[in-house]
Amino acid sequence: DTPETFGLGIAVNLTKKFDFAFDWQRVNYSDIKAIGLPIEQLALPNGEGFLGEDQGAGFGWNDRNVYKVGVKYKHDQKWDFQLGYNYSESPMPNDQLLFSTLAPAVTEHHLTLGATYKPSQSVEWTFAYVHAFNNRESGLAQSAGQFDQFFPNETADGPGDVELEMVQDSIELTFAYKL
């Protein structure tokens, strides 16, 4: 399942050479059981805690707001240059990190650089570089006491602490042909 996502944006031509854009986006992870339900559901009695069901466990992610700003510089008829920034808090509460080891989306700040080359009216090449800055989340694998039945000999409550860290870099090259 994919969470509901919606947003609003505005773009302004500041000058003949500069455009500015701002976007706000909302991602509703809580609408998707496998993503929004807390991991504590796994420990429910009578087998009610199956993954992805109404009473099942999930990643425990919070809904999130994403804020984006961007600037485009129109150098000439053939070249445009873009710069963008994106911020969003990590959707993971510190007591819900166990399942998030499968999808450690903890990055919060992203910077994007791009260039578009238009050698003709119908051909366009775009290059982009995205850097998601390093971020680290740490906390309990789950809330205290929830997994005592599974880990009776542990001195801590359950499997212990979890630390997630992520940094990302990506490069994109696209070609467009306009008919």
Residue ranges and their predicted role:
Residues D1-L179:
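Outer-membrane beta-barrel porins/channels
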